[in-house]
Each structure stands twice: as structure tokens, then as C-alpha cells.
Amino acid sequence: MSNLINLNNIVYQVDKKYILKDVNCHINKNGILSILGPNGAGKTTLLKIMAGLIKPTSGSIKFNYKLPIGFVFQKPVLLNRSVEYNLIHALKYSIRPQIDQSKELVNHILNENKLSYLKDKPAKKISGGEQQLVSILRACIIKPEVLFFDEPTSNLDSEFKNTIEELILSASKKTKVIIVSQDQMMARKIADELLFLDRGTIRSEY
């Protein structure tokens, strides 16, 4: 079975400073990969390269996944419209044949996750934890082949962390999940594979 992503000799520099150096890894198509490491290790940069959001300075990448992908940022990026609108808007950019049923699909996913009370609320006025939940649902609703998470539980209380952990585990049954997290307990708990990055270099994989 071919790998989902192949990274060979990846280098990423900013103003001649190495953010990533000689990164080689081969990501399989199933389960959850957690990328761990200290602040400044290059984790988010590596995640964005894996997602095709930025290009490396040198090295080669082979992507064996199809668009769309889902990407959940550390700080939720939502439109200043209702939660329902944000989810429907995501479907407009999906290549999946589900647009005609978009409202029904949005209602279903909100009800399924006990978040129907958020449907008509402005996304910018709900709590930070609720915004992150909506961001995750927005990423999942397009049924991507890969879901990328950049510090999804940062600065959230334990209740929201637990809910997000459950969402990630649920999503991983249908799609590959790659997550960057400083929360080592959570990242290790849910991961099928771990990759440890330090000073821009992979130190271990297991």
C-alpha cells in the first residue's frame, strides 16, 4: 500500500535560518499521527508543508491524497455570520456531491454533536471552545481524505478538550488525522503513530 505523504530531504528556511532541515518521513494512510516537540521545533511549519499550504525551500514531496483537505488552526478562523452559514459556506468549496442537501447535512451534524443550540448564533460571539468545535465540524463536513490539526486544544478548558478529543477520534475512523499538539498526554493517548521533532529535525518515530 502506498504512503499518503512522502517527504524527502525537506529544508525550510526563513532569512537563511533553518526552520526544518533534512526532514524525511513517510506517512501512511490510516489512523492518527501526532507530531510532538518543544516550542520552535518547526512542528506547525512541517504540518503546513504536509498540507500543501506552504512550499519547502528544497526537497521533494509526493502527495497521494485528493482534495479537499481539512485544516483546523490553533485560532479559529470563522466568518462573522451564523454558525449554520459557516458550515454551509464550507460545503460550497467541497468537490463532494452533497451541496443540494447542505442545510439538512448541517442540521444533522449539529444535532449529532449536540450543538444545535449554536445554529443561528453569530460565530464570532460564541465562546472560544465553541468556535473551535465549529471549526472542526466545518473541516469534517466536507469529508476530506486528510484532516490536519494545529494545536486544536490550546488555551481551552478540560471540558472542551475532552469533546475535541472525541471529535478527533471519531473523525479518524473515516479519514487520516495529522495533529500538532503541545498537550503530550492527549496527543500520545489518541495517536497510532508519534513523530518527535526538535530544532527542525525528526529525532524519533514510533
PLM region spans:
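The feature captures the beta-strand-to-loop junction immediately N-terminal to the Walker
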Residues: 36-38
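Helix-to-loop junction immediately C-terminal to a conserved catalytic motif
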Residues: 51
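Conserved catalytic motifs of ABC-family nucleotide-binding domains
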Residues: 76-85, 89, 96
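Conserved ABC ATPase "signature" region
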Residues: 100-118
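Conserved ABC ATPase signature
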Residues: 122-126, 130
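Catalytic Walker B motif of ABC-type/P-loop ATPase nucleotide-binding domains
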Residues: 147-150
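Conserved H-loop
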Residues: 175-181
